[in-house]
């Protein structure tokens, strides 16, 4: 029986550690370490340097996942990139990651399908389920799934924005979902959504400045 399992994992966070105290001393936010820690459990987050894109973070995580799985980029059959902070409105980060992995270079070129999944916090789970389905169906042997965000450039790093600015940072994680004939791997996946509450937390495109 054809099964799917996670053959490799990788993660990456930028080197700039921003502590709760840094939010006050570096950015002038009226807050404190104790206030944030008590309400969120967060002690620190990472911020990317200027010019570092979400696909750059995804690349580092992807390289580590490939190494962990003992695979090369050319072994991949599909790239899935989950993010709500892409490099551009379009195209998606997946095609940028494909190029950065060297899959568009000369004799090593392998133009595998690459697509983004934009489903907010659940995007990585939906991507993992999609990878699972591709592998189980026989359409792919190795699928790269990346979840990455670069939220720091969009944060209101002021006292006015502290309700959100204290929560988010930048980073990436990646897994390789691979085929196996052994009786092991990812079990049954069950996804669901409830559109009745879609407007409870939303941002309309035309509201984005």
Briefly describe each language-model feature range:
Residues 7, 82, 118, 143-149, ...:
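Short beta-strand segments
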Residues 61-77:
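Phosphate/pyrophosphate-binding loops at sites that engage ATP/ADP/AMP, CoA/4′-phosphopantetheine
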Residues 136-171:
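Flexible, glycine-rich active-site loops centered on histidine and acidic residues
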């Amino acid at each position: 029986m054809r099964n799917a399992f996670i053959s490799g994992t990788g993660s990456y966070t930028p080197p700039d550690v921003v502590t709760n105290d840094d939010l006050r001393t570096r950015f002038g936010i009226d807050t404190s370490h104790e206030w944030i820690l008590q309400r969120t459990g967060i002690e620190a987050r990472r911020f990317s340097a200027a010019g570092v894109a979400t696909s750059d973070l995804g690349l580092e995580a992807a390289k580590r996942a490939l190494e962990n799985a003992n695979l090369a980029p050319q072994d991949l059959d599909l790239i899935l990139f989950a993010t709500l902070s892409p490099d551009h409105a379009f195209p998606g980060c997946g095609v940028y990651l494909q190029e950065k992995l060297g899959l568009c270079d000369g004799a090593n070129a392998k133009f595998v399908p690459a697509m983004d999944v934009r489903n907010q916090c659940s995007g990585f789970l939906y991507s993992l389920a999609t990878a699972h389905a591709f592998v189980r169906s026989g359409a792919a042997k190795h699928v790269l799934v990346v979840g990455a965000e670069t939220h720091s450039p969009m944060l209101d790093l002021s006292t006015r924005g502290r309700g959100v600015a204290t929560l988010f940072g930048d980073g990436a994680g990646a897994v390789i979902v691979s085929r196996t004939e052994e009786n092991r791997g990812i079990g049954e996946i069950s996804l669901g959504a409830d559109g009745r509450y879609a407007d409870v937390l939303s941002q309309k495109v035309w509201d984005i400045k």
